[in-house]
């Protein structure tokens, strides 16, 4: 039986290093950043949720359900994940940030295979050198654990998943897959990468 997989695109942050611009809506080569992310993951999942805490109407124009953090105060990616985990009945939830326009087109199958091979609860993507803590495939049943972690004042995603049985799936074969945009300079470099 094939596993049902939904996705959440995290666009709920403050984007301080982008001068406060809403990263998912910043244009990259004529399209909103989040549109590039959607195009990469849409063929790999059943449903997509967009986690946004501002500009929700703009995000809704992409045709997917927009959800805002249950926990107020811009508490970071865990808050968006918790909200999404409460909105899906899928077997697994893929978590990706809104500013990774070069995500692997084989992200889900490889991460799912890694989970199944190790009978793990979570798969974390890696670029071959570093883990990518906000590129995860996880079981939504872990929501209570994540909620308790956040409500205890913790914020770091990698500290949370370290408490569970997780596997790391390396995408060293796609070195630019997780390049993201935190500054206008990075945006410029990425625009050149996409047009190659």
Swiss-Prot record:
What Gene Ontology molecular-function terms does this entry list?
GTP binding; metal ion binding; molybdenum cofactor guanylyltransferase activity
**What SUPFAM superfamilies does the annotation carry?**
Nucleotide-diphospho-sugar transferases
Write down the top EC class of this protein: transferase
Major place of residence: cytoplasm
**What reaction does this catalyse?**
Mo-molybdopterin + GTP + H(+) = Mo-molybdopterin guanine dinucleotide + diphosphate
Q: State the EC number(s).
A: 2.7.7.77
Q: Which cofactor does it need?
A: Mg(2+)
Does the record carry Phosphoprotein as a key word? Answer: no
Q: Does the keyword rRNA-binding apply?
A: no
GO terms under cellular component:
cytoplasm
Compartment(s) where it occurs, according to its Swiss-Prot or TrEMBL record: Cytoplasm
Q: Where does the chain bind Mg(2+)? A: 99
| Subunit relationships | Monomer.
- NCBIfam families under this entry? molyb_mobA (TIGR02665)
What functional role does this protein have?
Transfers a GMP moiety from GTP to Mo-molybdopterin (Mo-MPT) cofactor (Moco or molybdenum cofactor) to form Mo-molybdopterin guanine dinucleotide (Mo-MGD) cofactor.
What is said about the domains? The N-terminal domain determines nucleotide recognition and specific binding, while the C-terminal domain determines the specific binding to the target protein.
| Family to which this protein belongs | Belongs to the MobA family.
Q: What is this protein called?
A: Molybdenum cofactor guanylyltransferase
């Amino acid at each position: 039986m094939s596993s049902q997989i939904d996705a959440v695109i995290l666009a709920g942050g403050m984007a301080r290093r982008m001068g406060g611009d809403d990263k998912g809506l910043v244009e990259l080569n004529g399209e909103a950043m989040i549109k590039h992310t959607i195009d990469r993951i849409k063929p790999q999942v059943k449903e997509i949720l967009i986690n946004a805490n501002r500009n929700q109407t703009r995000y809704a124009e992409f045709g997917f359900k927009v959800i805002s953090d249950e926990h107020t105060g811009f508490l970071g990616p865990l808050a968006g994940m918790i909200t999404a985990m409460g909105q899906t009945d899928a077997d697994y939830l893929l978590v990706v940030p809104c500013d990774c326009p070069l995500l692997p087109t084989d992200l889900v199958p490889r991460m799912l295979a890694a989970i199944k091979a190790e009978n793990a609860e979570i798969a974390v993507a890696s670029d071959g050198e570093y883990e990518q803590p906000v590129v995860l495939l996880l079981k939504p049943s872990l929501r209570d654990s994540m909620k308790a972690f956040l409500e205890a004042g913790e914020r770091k995603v990698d500290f949370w998943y370290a408490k569970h049985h997780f596997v790391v799936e390396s995408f060293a074969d796609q070195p630019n897959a997780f390049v993201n945009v935190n500054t206008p300079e990075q945006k410029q470099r990425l625009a050149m990468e996409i047009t190659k």
